[in-house]
């Protein structure tokens, strides 16, 4: 019984010892990149080292220093060479027994460099400390879904636990890794980045990286508007967005995927002109550009047009007007106005709101072209549209390849429309081409076997109008068919009603009820299997009268009355006046008005509605004179300006100077200039007249005074003197004087900034109040002399001239007195220098002589002492010798 009790006690003690040899659960670890410590509670076992077993190679032991005070703290400095070794397949410690270190006591890994794997996944670098404290092959991602990040080469002898590769799975956005000790690490995949944005007519292609695959939803916004998920497709490297922008504009695009936001990027929707017509080199004309985004998003139409600049080569095309989002017009001046303008391959530049097109479109003068898609055939009169069609006398027309003489050929002044009656011999297909100035156009084919004509009545803008069309060459199989008209832009179909009993079945008239509309409409007429093209033009607006009302010198209005059509279409109307397109703020069917503003001038006023223009009304605005400016005159003349308001190019004004009339130049509606190339220096009075003599006056041209800035260097011997400055005049009467006494002769004008003359030698008697002493305060070399330069009525005076002190040569007897004086001054200077030298010698001698005497005395004393010592020595030697001899 006692033995059994003893065994139980021993087993209990042994088990108790085992428990108390384990590390207390309250132990905790503190670590950073250079430090690792374990904190053990009071009465707990502790360890002073950790042992790391590796897959390959020897194990590594990390030793700690331990301090016991209110528990025990064991710590170790973690040096760079140690960081690479503290990892292992097994980590153990020993007290009285060896134990495996619990994962809760692993230090939390420290990631020291940014860790943002690509969304495609793949190889990334992980850097830090304690990253693989317990040697492993992967990290566990727990959010947003469970995935593994694999550690590469962890079993290799060359494995660096502070810097190694990991293989990441595809992912997106924020992720969470759970470390071995239970702590969490947040990281995110790379943010999306945009490298290239390509804008197409119907989509935007965004190329970049890290957009995440299609399994992750994205929020894409353009100017804050969310793009629906159904309107884009994406992968990690690109996004294709279905998007159409009709205007030239800068927009902001933001891409957000899985709560990761890219940098907001500006995308620019640039104008893209694709087609341009041609105009004659000698005339210029209206250019029509067609393409994409040919308008701004400005709601004010006037501001929209003000922000449009079109350049053909280096020429600015004036009065640019955005007709629609796809079309712009402007007026191009004749090419011969600028001799540097070439005929061909001029680049077209369209700038809207400071945004310029990038695509390449070239313009060529004088390209003869027929438009195959725009023609009409009323009553066998073929009406063609095109470019550079020439004139009725010079254009050659080819029908079916043969030159055809046409007596009724009509071509408008702009060379854009051509019409003629088709000769009777042509019955079916007609091939048409023209030749202008030996340039042959393209050839177009027209079916003339079936055509139509209509009455002169215009469809109304206010209501339905019956218009009678007569159809010709109707085929027999179509006799009983009901004809129809299709208004092409709106695709409105109107059926015709017969208006007469046919006497000839192949020619028949029908009435068509045309609905209210606006502008010119292309139509297609169909009967059975036959069709042809034609057009109808709605009511043409009429201007009866226009006047300027209520102008007080600053404000006023232009008011017009007439017949302007249906009020419902007036929103599509505008006024062309003074090279501007104006939207009248006040308008109804009979009246419109708009403000009179600076920049307007007398001009033809045209009202247009839906592209149909009224006949021009000549509106006269009395010009207003506000002032003149002749301040920009220089030595050779300059500009004279008449300033005011409402000037036109044909305003009558003139300037007379010295009974000569000078030609005006119209600058703009506020400025007229005159180039008065009248050389100075003598001021003159001129006369101007303005607005047919309603205002006259005199003005004086005052030329600037000359300004002397510098002269060349010259000595008293005289010689060529160059004078530099500004505002010199090329006149015969030029005078140059020094100190009001010495006159310069042989004066020569060089340019507006310099002249030369010969200055005679200096004569002392002329300067009776001065002495020619180089170092005297009264010498002519020590101060600047008065220089006078006169160009007829203009004089400059100033103390700027000074003689040079350079060596003076005896060139003639007139210089002897000067040279004698100079030599006298030099002799005086030499005497002064000698006197100064004597004084210096005396001072030096008084210092050196006593020193020399002291040196001699000292030397004598030294010699005397030496002699005495020798005498004494010789005496001592003699006495010794005597004693030796005695011995």
From Swiss-Prot:
Chief location of this protein?
A: membrane
The terms describing its cellular component in GO are: external side of plasma membrane
Mind listing the UniProt keywords for this protein, alphabetically? Glycoprotein, Membrane, Repeat, Signal, Transmembrane, Transmembrane helix
Q: Which InterPro entries match?
A: Dictyostelium_Tiger, Ig_E-set
Source taxon at top rank: Eukaryota
Intervals, Extracellular compartment: 22-845
Protein name per UniProt = Tiger protein O1
Protein species of origin = Dictyostelium discoideum
């Amino acid at each position: 019984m006692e033995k059994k009790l003893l065994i139980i006690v021993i087993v209990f003690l042994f088990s108790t010892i085992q428990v108390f040899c384990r590390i207390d659960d309250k132990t905790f670890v503190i670590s950073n990149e250079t430090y690792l410590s374990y904190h053990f509670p009071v009465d707990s076992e502790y360890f002073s080292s950790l042992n790391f077993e590796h897959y390959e190679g020897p194990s590594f032991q990390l030793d700690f220093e331990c301090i016991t005070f209110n528990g025990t703290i064991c710590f170790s400095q973690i040096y760079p060479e140690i960081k690479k070794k503290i990892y292992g397949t097994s980590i153990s410690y020993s007290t009285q027994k060896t134990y495996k270190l619990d994962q809760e006591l692993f230090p939390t890994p420290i990631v020291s460099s940014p860790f943002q794997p690509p969304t495609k996944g793949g190889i990334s670098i992980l850097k830090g400390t304690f990253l693989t404290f317990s040697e492993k092959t992967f990290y566990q991602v727990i959010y947003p879904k469970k995935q593994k990040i694999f550690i590469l080469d962890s079993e290799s002898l060359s494995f660096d636990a502070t810097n190694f590769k990991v293989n990441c799975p595809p992912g997106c956005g924020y992720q969470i890794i759970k470390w071995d000790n239970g702590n969490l690490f947040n990281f995110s995949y790379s943010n999306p980045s945009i490298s290239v944005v390509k804008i197409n007519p119907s989509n935007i292609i965004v190329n970049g990286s890290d957009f995440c695959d299609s399994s992750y939803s994205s929020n894409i916004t353009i100017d804050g508007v969310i793009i629906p998920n159904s309107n884009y497709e994406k992968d990690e490297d690109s996004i294709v967005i279905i998007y159409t922008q009709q205007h030239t504009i800068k927009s902001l695009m933001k891409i957000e995927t899985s709560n990761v936001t890219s940098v907001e990027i500006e995308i620019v929707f640039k104008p893209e002109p694709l087609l341009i017509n041609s105009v004659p080199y000698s005339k210029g004309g209206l250019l029509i550009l067609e393409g994409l985004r040919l308008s701004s998003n400005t709601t004010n139409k006037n501001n929209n047009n003000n922000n449009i600049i079109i350049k053909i080569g280096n020429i600015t095309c004036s009065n640019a007007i955005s007709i629609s989002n796809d079309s712009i017009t402007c007026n191009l001046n004749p090419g011969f106005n600028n001799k540097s303008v070439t005929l061909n391959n001029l680049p077209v530049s369209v700038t809207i709101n400071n945004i310029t097109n990038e695509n390449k479109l070239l313009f060529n003068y004088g390209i003869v072209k027929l438009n195959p898609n725009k023609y009409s055939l009323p009553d066998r009169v073929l009406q063609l549209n095109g470019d550079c069609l020439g004139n009725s006398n010079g254009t050659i027309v080819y029908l079916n390849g043969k030159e055809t003489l046409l007596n009724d050929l009509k071509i408008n002044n702009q060379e854009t429309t051509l019409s003629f009656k088709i000769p009777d011999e042509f019955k079916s297909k007609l091939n048409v081409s023209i030749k202008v100035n030996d340039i042959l156009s393209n050839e177009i084919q027209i079916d003339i076997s079936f055509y139509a004509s209509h009455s002169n009545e215009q469809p109304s803008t206010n209501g339905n109008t019956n218009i009678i069309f007569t159809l010709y060459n109707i085929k027999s199989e179509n006799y009983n068919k009901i004809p129809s008209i299709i208004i092409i832009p709106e695709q409105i179909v109107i059926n015709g009603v017969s208006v007469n009993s046919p006497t000839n079945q192949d020619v028949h008239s029908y009435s068509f009820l045309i609905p209210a509309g606006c502008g010119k409409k292309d139509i297609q007429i169909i009967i059975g299997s036959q069709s042809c093209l034609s057009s109808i033009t709605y009511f043409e607006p009429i201007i009866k009268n226009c006047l300027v009302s209520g102008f007080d010198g600053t404000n006023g209005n232009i008011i017009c009355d007439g017949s302007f059509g249906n009020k419902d279409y007036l929103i599509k109307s505008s006024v062309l006046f003074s090279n501007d397109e104006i939207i009248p703020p006040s308008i109804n069917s009979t009246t419109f008005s708009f403000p009179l503003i600076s920049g307007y001038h007398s001009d033809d006023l045209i009202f247009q509605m839906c592209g149909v223009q009224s006949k021009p009304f000549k509106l006269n605005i009395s010009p207003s004179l506000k002032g003149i400016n002749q301040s920009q005159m220089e030595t050779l003349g300059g500009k004279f300006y008449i300033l005011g308001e409402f000037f036109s190019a044909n305003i009558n004004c003139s300037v007379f100077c010295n009974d000569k009339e000078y030609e005006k130049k119209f600058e703009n509606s506020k400025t007229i200039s005159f180039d008065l190339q009248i050389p100075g220096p003598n001021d003159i009075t001129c006369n101007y007249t303005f607005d047919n003599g309603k205002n006259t006056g005199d003005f004086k041209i005052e030329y600037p005074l000359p300004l002397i800035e510098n002269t060349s260097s010259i000595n008293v011997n005289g010689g060529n003197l160059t004078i530099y400055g500004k505002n010199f005049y090329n006149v015969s009467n030029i005078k140059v004087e020094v100190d009001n006494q010495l006159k310069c002769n042989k004066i020569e004008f060089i340019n507006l900034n310099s002249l030369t003359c010969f200055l005679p030698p200096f004569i002392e008697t002329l300067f009776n109040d001065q002495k020619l002493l180089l170092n005297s305060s009264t010498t002519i070399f020590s101060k600047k002399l008065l220089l006078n330069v006169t160009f007829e009525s203009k004089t400059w005076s100033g103390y700027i001239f000074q003689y040079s002190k350079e060596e003076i040569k005896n060139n003639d007897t007139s210089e002897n007195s000067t040279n004698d004086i100079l030599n006298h001054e030099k002799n005086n200077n030499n005497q002064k220098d000698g006197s100064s030298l004597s004084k210096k010698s005396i001072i030096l001698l008084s210092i050196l002589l006593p020193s020399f005497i002291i040196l001699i005395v000292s030397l004598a004393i030294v010699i005397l002492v030496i002699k005495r010592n020798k005498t004494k020595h010789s005496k001592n030697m003699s006495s010794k010798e005597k004693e030796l001899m005695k011995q």
